[in-house]
């Protein structure tokens, strides 16, 4: 029985990934598009309450792809890397992967060091969430306290409210 050959005919396939990208858009535009598009699609899946196994895998892959595309952008900042690692940590926490969540949360804190209290507070939120997944009550309490310390220093009411809500949801998980 012959097998199915799913390869493109040579006449249809680009000779390189660069040729494929440059045929329609340039690389910078592609990275710009996919860094945001993949982040937003991952975020949609984070918010979804009943994800399938496939959607969980897609959520992780989209976040990883987004972060990689950010690293390829000439305008990538430490804030972008902080946000990307925060999202990745959140996803690993949702998937119950404590060690991966912690690694990404530590990267988030690293990239947040010289940014605003909002980003540092969220890095500690990610560290607290990963500690919760690891059942590390001491680490969770420490990073919740740190996040609250930075929360008090956030000047924007809207940003402060967003972090406050995430901290309360995390604190509520212990009470549930």
Task: Please identify what each model-predicted range represents.
Residues 64-71, 106-113, 146-156:
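Amphipathic alpha-helical segments of tetratricopeptide repeats
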Residues 36-37, 81-83, 122, 162:
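Residue register of alpha-helical TPR repeats
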Residues 40, 87, 126, 163-170:
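"A position-specific structural signal for the A-helix of alpha-solenoid helical repeats
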């Amino acid at each position: 029985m012959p097998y199915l050959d799913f390869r493109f005919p040579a006449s249809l396939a680009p000779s390189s990934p660069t040729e494929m990208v440059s045929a329609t858009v340039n690389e910078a535009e592609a990275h710009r598009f996919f860094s945001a598009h993949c982040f937003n699609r991952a975020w949609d899946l984070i918010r979804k309450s009943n994800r399938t196994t496939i959607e969980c895998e897609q959520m992780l892959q989209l976040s990883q792809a987004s972060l990689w595309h950010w690293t390829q952008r000439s305008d990538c900042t430490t804030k972008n890397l902080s946000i990307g690692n925060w999202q990745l940590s959140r996803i690993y926490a949702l998937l119950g992967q404590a060690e991966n969540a912690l690694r990404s949360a530590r990267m988030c804190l690293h990239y947040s060091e010289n940014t605003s209290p909002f980003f540092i507070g969220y890095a500690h939120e990610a560290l607290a969430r990963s500690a919760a997944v690891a059942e590390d009550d001491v680490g969770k309490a420490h990073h919740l306290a740190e996040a609250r310390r930075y929360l008090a220093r956030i000047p924007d009411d809207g940003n402060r409210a967003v972090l406050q809500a995430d901290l309360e949801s995390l604190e509520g998980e212990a009470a549930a």
